[in-house]
């Protein structure tokens, strides 16, 4: 029986060439799988047909936008997920859902292996292959770009030689990845960490230095998940899409950072994530209003670790599942509305309210109606500072 390989297919040069490359190198039949996670751009039916033209025996397109939002973006919002306190895991979140569908397709079509188009310098190779190890350890993984020396020049020559329907005349200077949660750009002039990113690299966001009227949004949350915008109940997909448009129009969500990659190198990355930054800003602020202090403090460490393991390709790990259990529990009661002003590239919280607010005006006010008994403070300070006082007395005794 002829071997079958399921290829993570984007419709671009590398994965289109990989269809024929895999067939020529291994004799296997290739099943192309494109997963729609809200990346936009080219029509997915055109991509599906291109795979057939390039030699695939089967071509599948999966609309996974709702699943991506509900099962991957939503947990990231609850976990305030920002790798290195800045990057909202745009690509990191999309890889495990692609792996999930690759494995399902492999089982359905009797495939022996899956394939991806990742290089050996990036994080995605780890995310794909460790994900496969977790879900289907018996499947082999083929990585033609990394393992077979399939350079861009060789890929172009391969495509031209076989007349593949791929336009390679307009080579973008950037490597782009995008989905519902944001857009990433690297390579080209961006590899110089001193060089200012040219404006043509940005697509999701307007220039934040240009003066324009501000916008204001009110985001509603239920148990830590966004459920409405400006009083309208919306699905998470629609809510994120609208915020990408409105916050992006105000230049919100541009990130220029030096990132520590999993493989050990530093890279310069440009991200555009207007909805992600707006939602994470609002969610964290609502947590400050509703979470008990020790839970909030502990959760910050959990959130950081959650972002790290997802970035590192361990979505399917038992640790992430365990962290999710804490995050889900802590999120109960994180319900309310957050009002955000969008202007000049900044999403600024200007108001928040919650039926479960722990803010007590009668305790916080310095005006009439203050119910905080300030005479309690002296005894509290004496007890709170007692360990420090005892330690200081010992130090003075031993080191007069």
From Swiss-Prot:
SUPFAM superfamilies: Adenine nucleotide alpha hydrolases-like, Argininosuccinate synthetase, C-terminal domain. Pfam families: Arginosuc_syn_C, Arginosuc_synth. This is Argininosuccinate synthase. ATP binds at residues 8-16, 117. The keyword Electron transport does not apply. NCBIfam families: argG, PRK00509.1. The keyword Nucleotide-binding applies. PROSITE patterns: ARGININOSUCCIN_SYN_1, ARGININOSUCCIN_SYN_2. It is found in: Cytoplasm. It comes from Parafrankia sp. (strain EAN1pec). One of its GO terms (biological process) is urea cycle. GO terms for cellular component: cytoplasm. It is an enzyme of class 6 (ligase). Disulfide bonds: none annotated. Pathway: Amino-acid biosynthesis; L-arginine biosynthesis; L-arginine from L-ornithine and carbamoyl phosphate: step 2/3. InterPro entries: Arginosuc_syn_C, Arginosuc_syn_N, Arginosuc_synth, Arginosuc_synth_CS, Arginosuc_synth_type_1_subfam, AS_cat/multimer_dom_body, Rossmann-like_a/b/a_fold. GO terms for molecular function: argininosuccinate synthase activity; ATP binding. Belongs to the argininosuccinate synthase family. Type 1 subfamily. It comes from the Bacteria. Keywords: Amino-acid biosynthesis, Arginine biosynthesis, ATP-binding, Cytoplasm, Ligase, Nucleotide-binding. The gene is argG. It catalyses: L-citrulline + L-aspartate + ATP = 2-(N(omega)-L-arginino)succinate + AMP + diphosphate + H(+). L-aspartate binds at residues 119, 123-124. Homotetramer.
